[in-house]
């Protein structure tokens, strides 16, 4: 009796025109990209999105079950779907906030009003987050970050290239002011909207760019209350916090979770100090009416889901169509699922795991992760550019990695979330914001819960958290093409194996390498090794700076100088993760073959190549070839041009084709797999290839 092995790839979908040596990404994904037409309600679609769509349908089934065990999620979802009630409520959701802004007679009163809005979600000039202190990662602390903008980032306010987007933004703001009856006519609305853009442009002038905010050292600025208060002397930090405390104390959430706001802010981490001092100067110089206008507009923009349909439609016209190229709003139930996932995802996620995640997948993943960690151990030990002292510290960090697979073992308690079936959507959202405020701020000063997940199990993604030194793989990503328990190992190591390797690699990328095995921001590198590492990463930055996504090269074919490039400095962390992930996953695949053959694992390149050569040939492809074909398939993606351009500005991930071809051309075994020659499109001279881990 013979057993047919499942290759885990789909050769019938590959290109008959382009070969892998010319363009690996187009060979695997080109026919699909050429054939697939994005639905009007999507600005992108691909392998990740297909799995997200599957999870979306599964969550809907749970939420619409009459006996839904996730009662809070069910109630929130139902209130969001009640469009008639939302439309009938008019401006009720924001009337109190608008009134509080209007009656402020001076800046001190406006500060008080903004603070009072915080518990239930109000406009933010200052961003607040709670997680581990990089200097003492076992304890949670407040992180203060730049905020206050409605466009994706500060570049949108200053670069000529974004002038059309700024014009559309002004148009959207004008329409929202009219929708809210805050402008008498089009002329007044347009004038106010232009003033609003001017105000935000002044705020944006103090923002750090996306490359600077990636610097873990520069963004770690422990600050006590006196220093923070001095930085925000004119904004009046005392008044802001006191009004926040007073407003919170009057809510039901305070009875469940009392908070001492002054104590919470005793010690904080400021990420961008010059933003705070710049914000303070802006606040001091700004006209009161301009500050009120900024606050009004952000109240509206932040509440469009809770307001009548014209607010939602106006919001979509800009954020959906103009910024992302999406032609049509997603149907209501899909947006409702996304909302529930964001507000109380573990509530419904617990049921999702029961119904859709087999325990056998978790066990298989544990084997994969074990081989990946073994492969990293070998790569670090055998590194030619890393000194012995740094190697030992890297190995110590690796030994402290904690993998988490599928779902949390410590589900969040939603008993304090006062979401009810008989409440309106705005009321339920207010309750959700109050719950989240109490939940997050109550963690300040307490020990970090390493069992807490930052993603729901129904999320198609994975992450590495440097202050906890954990790698996390939610249940929803553990499906084909990433993971197929019935496939031969090549496809799984090229798919989820590369993702696992990528996330472990974040522990040793330009950011993660600054944290030790306990999650502490700690310079554990020798100067020589750090210089070697920076030299390697600069080569990778230079490579990626040269890339222009094919679709944008075609869009700007008449004026190539205007075509936007990948930002190698912005994407370097993810690119290191990708490159490390592929190289390490290849070794791990060889180790898996060794286990099957009963051989001892040997990390030398000769042994790795010998093991890979013994992989079975399936569907006409060797194991080594199937590995790379599987890797390319997970990046199957199609974007609208607008979204592709936005991603180049703000996303630390490179475009899908660069994550495929840009990585493969740096991996020596790729050349062996497909007999790549100097005249082939994928060729990169050996001395230009970057080898890190």
Regions found by a protein language model. Name each.
Residues 2, 52, 196, 255-258, ...:
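Intrinsically disordered, low-complexity linker/terminal regions across diverse proteins
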Residues 2-5, 18-22, 27-88:
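Active-site-surrounding "flap" and adjacent substrate/cofactor-binding loops of secreted or lumenal enzymes
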Residues 35-39, 129, 153-155, 207-209, ...:
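Short, solvent-exposed loop/turn and secondary-structure capping segments
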Residues 8-20, 568:
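A charge-rich, low-complexity, intrinsically flexible signal that marks solvent-exposed coils, linkers
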Residues 64-367, 371:
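Noncatalytic, helix-rich "gating/capping" subdomain that lines the substrate-entry/channel surface
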Residues 41-63, 186-206, 492-498, 615-620, ...:
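Short secondary-structure subsegments characteristic of cysteine-rich extracellular domains
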Residues 16-20, 134-136, 464-467, 620-622:
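Extracellular/periplasmic catalytic domains that process cell-envelope and extracellular macromolecules
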Residues 5-9, 150-154, 561-563:
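Flexible glycine/proline-enriched surface loops and loop-helix/loop-strand junctions
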């Amino acid at each position: 009796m013979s057993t047919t092995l499942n290759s885990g790839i789909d050769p019938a979908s590959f290109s008959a025109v382009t070969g892998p040596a010319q363009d690996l990404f187009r060979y695997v994904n080109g026919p699909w990209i050429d054939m697939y037409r994005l639905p009007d309600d999507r600005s992108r679609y691909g392998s990740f999105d297909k799995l997200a769509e599957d999870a979306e349908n599964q969550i809907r089934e749970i939420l619409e079950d009459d006996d839904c065990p996730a009662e809070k999620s069910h109630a929130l979802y139902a209130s969001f779907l009640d469009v008639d009630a939302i439309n009938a409520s008019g401006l009720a959701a924001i009337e109190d906030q608008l009134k509080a802004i209007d009656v402020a007679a001076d800046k001190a009163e406006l500060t008080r009003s903004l603070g009072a809005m915080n518990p239930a979600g109000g406009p933010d000039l200052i961003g607040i987050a709670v997680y581990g202190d990089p200097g003492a990662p076992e304890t949670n602390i407040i992180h203060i970050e730049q905020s206050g903008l409605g466009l994706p980032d500060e570049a949108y306010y200053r670069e000529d290239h974004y002038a059309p987007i700024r014009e559309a933004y002004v148009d959207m703001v004008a329409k929202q002011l009219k929708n809210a009856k805050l402008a008498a006519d089009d002329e007044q609305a347009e004038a106010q909207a232009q003033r609003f853009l001017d105000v935000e442009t002044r705020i944006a002038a103090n923002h750090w760019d996306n490359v600077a905010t990636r610097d873990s050292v520069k963004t770690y600025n422990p600050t006590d209350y006196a220093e923070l208060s001095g930085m925000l002397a004119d904004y009046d930090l005392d008044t802001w916090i006191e009004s926040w405390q007073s407003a919170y104390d009057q809510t039901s959430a305070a009875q469940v979770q009392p908070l001492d706001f002054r104590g919470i802010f005793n010690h904080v981490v400021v990420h961008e100090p010059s933003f705070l001092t710049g914000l303070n100067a802006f606040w001091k110089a700004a006209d009161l009416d301009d500050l009120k206008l900024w606050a009004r507009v952000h109240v509206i923009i932040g509440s469009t889901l809770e307001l009548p349909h014209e607010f939602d439609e106006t919001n979509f016209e800009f954020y959906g169509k103009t910024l992302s190229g999406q032609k049509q709003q997603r149907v209501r139930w899909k947006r409702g699922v996304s909302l529930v996932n964001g507000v109380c995802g573990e509530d419904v996620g617990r049921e999702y795991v029961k119904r859709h995640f087999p325990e056998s997948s978790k066990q298989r993943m544990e084997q994969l992760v074990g081989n990946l960690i073994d492969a990293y151990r070998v790569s670090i030990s055998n590194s030619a550019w890393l000194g012995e002292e740094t190697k030992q510290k890297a190995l110590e960090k690796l030994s402290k990695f904690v993998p988490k697979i599928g779902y949390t073992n410590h589900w969040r308690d939603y008993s304090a979330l006062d979401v009810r079936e008989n409440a309106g959507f705005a009321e339920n959202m207010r309750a959700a914001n109050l719950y989240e405020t109490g939940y997050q701020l109550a963690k300040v000063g307490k020990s970090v819960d390493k069992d807490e997940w930052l993603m729901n199990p129904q999320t198609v993604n994975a992450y590495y958290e440097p202050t906890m030194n954990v790698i996390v793989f939610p249940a929803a990503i553990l499906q084909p093409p990433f993971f197929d328990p019935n496939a031969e190992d090549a496809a799984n190591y090229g798919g989820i194996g590369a993702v696992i390797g990528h996330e472990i690699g974040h522990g040793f990328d330009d950011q993660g390498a600054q944290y030790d095995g306990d999650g502490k921001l700690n310079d554990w590198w020798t100067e020589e090794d750090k210089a070697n590492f920076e030299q390697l990463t600069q080569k990778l930055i230079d490579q990626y700076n040269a890339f222009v996504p094919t679709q944008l090269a075609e869009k700007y074919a008449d004026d190539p100088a205007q075509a936007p490039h990948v930002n190698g400095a912005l994407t370097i962390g993810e690119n290191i993760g990708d490159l490390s992930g592929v190289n390490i996953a290849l070794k791990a695949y060889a180790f898996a073959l060794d286990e099957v053959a009963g051989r001892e694992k040997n990390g030398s390149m000769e042994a790795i190549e010998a093991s890979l050569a013994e992989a079975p040939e399936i569907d006409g492809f060797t194991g080594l070839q199937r590995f790379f074909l599987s890797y390319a398939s997970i990046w199957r993606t199609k974007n609208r041009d607008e979204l592709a351009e936005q991603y180049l500005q703000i996303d630390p991930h490179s475009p899908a084709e660069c994550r495929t071809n840009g990585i493969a051309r740096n991996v020596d075994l790729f050349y062996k797999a497909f007999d790549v020659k100097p005249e082939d499109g994928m060729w990169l001279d050996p001395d230009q290839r970057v080898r890190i881990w």
